[in-house]
Amino acid sequence: MARIAGVDLPREKRIEVALTYIYGIGRSTARRVIRETGVDPDTRVRDLAEGEIAALRRYIDENLKVEGDLKREVNQNIRRLMDIGCYRGLRHRRGLPVRGQRTKTNARQRKGPRPAIGGRKK
């Protein structure tokens, strides 16, 4: 099993799909990595040579921010918004939608479950 950026890639999948298991690499980035390293995109992970795995690992380490580094940067950006007190930071702090969505109805994903209100007796 190939291990790149701290992630075990599934052996049976094509390398293009397997690279998307790494946080921060989607389909287009995976295609770019494969093109730059010269690996055949139809190759299964189990069929990769050790040199190809090393080339992929080297390219990802040198050129991309993935996994823990990327998660840390995203969290720092959100924390910075909250510290400077801008509108987006306030929305993050209050747990409300940040990008202008309505909140009169919906927005349950960000707001959490509705508070229980007791039924009225007649």
UniProtKB/Swiss-Prot annotation:
Keywords: Ribonucleoprotein, Ribosomal protein, RNA-binding, rRNA-binding, tRNA-binding. GO terms for molecular function: rRNA binding; structural constituent of ribosome; tRNA binding. One of its GO terms (cellular component) is small ribosomal subunit. SUPFAM superfamilies: S13-like H2TH domain (SSF46946). Residues 94-122 are annotated as: Disordered. One of its GO terms (biological process) is translation. HAMAP family: Ribosomal_uS13. Part of the 30S ribosomal subunit. Forms a loose heterodimer with protein S19. Forms two bridges to the 50S subunit in the 70S ribosome. NCBIfam families: uS13_bact. Belongs to the universal ribosomal protein uS13 family. Located at the top of the head of the 30S subunit, it contacts several helices of the 16S rRNA. In the 70S ribosome it contacts the 23S rRNA (bridge B1a) and protein L5 of the 50S subunit (bridge B1b), connecting the 2 subunits; these bridges are implicated in subunit movement. Contacts the tRNAs in the A and P-sites. This is Small ribosomal subunit protein uS13. It comes from Rubrobacter xylanophilus (strain DSM 9941 / JCM 11954 / NBRC 16129 / PRD-1).
